[in-house]
Amino acid sequence: MNNVLYIAAGGAIGAVLRYSISILALQLFGTGFPFGTLIVNVAGSFLMGCIYALAELSHIGPEWKALIGVGLLGALTTFSTFSNETLLLLQQGELVKASLNVLLNLILCLTVVYLGQQLIYSRV
């Protein structure tokens, strides 16, 4: 039951962060491309790589993994919004933007989760 509370607390923080970052990205970049979602997914993926490497090395306990990895980063990152925004771009005839959105999210997120892990492993 304790993990549920950690996850809920982390989720509340992650959801507010996601909302705040999305609003800021809209103000900075406008509505032409879903930069807010890209930013939260890339940042969250990097942090996820760090958290899971720390957990694997036993430098953080399961409660921190639940709080940050499942709760905070689970609420911060968003596959459903990414999918919906990509579909909307396709429906608007924006094939290049939709393709770019898919490629950037997949390539950048996979790259930074790896880099996050390597950062932690290199410090040990």
Curated annotation (Swiss-Prot):
The keyword Coiled coil does not apply. GO terms for molecular function: fluoride channel activity; metal ion binding. PANTHER family: FLUORIDE EXPORT PROTEIN 1-RELATED. The chain crosses the membrane at residues 4-24, 35-55, 60-80, 100-120. The keyword Cell inner membrane applies. One of its GO terms (cellular component) is plasma membrane. Keywords: Cell inner membrane, Cell membrane, Ion channel, Ion transport, Membrane, Metal-binding, Sodium, Transmembrane, Transmembrane helix, Transport. HAMAP family: FluC. It catalyses: fluoride(in) = fluoride(out). Belongs to the fluoride channel Fluc/FEX (TC 1.A.43) family. Na(+) is not transported, but it plays an essential structural role and its presence is essential for fluoride channel function. Coiled coil: none annotated. InterPro entries: FluC. It is found in: Cell inner membrane. The gene is fluC. Na(+) binds at residues 74, 77. It is a multi-pass membrane protein. Fluoride-specific ion channel. Important for reducing fluoride concentration in the cell, thus reducing its toxicity. GO terms for biological process: cellular detoxification of fluoride. It comes from Shewanella amazonensis (strain ATCC BAA-1098 / SB2B). This is Fluoride-specific ion channel FluC.
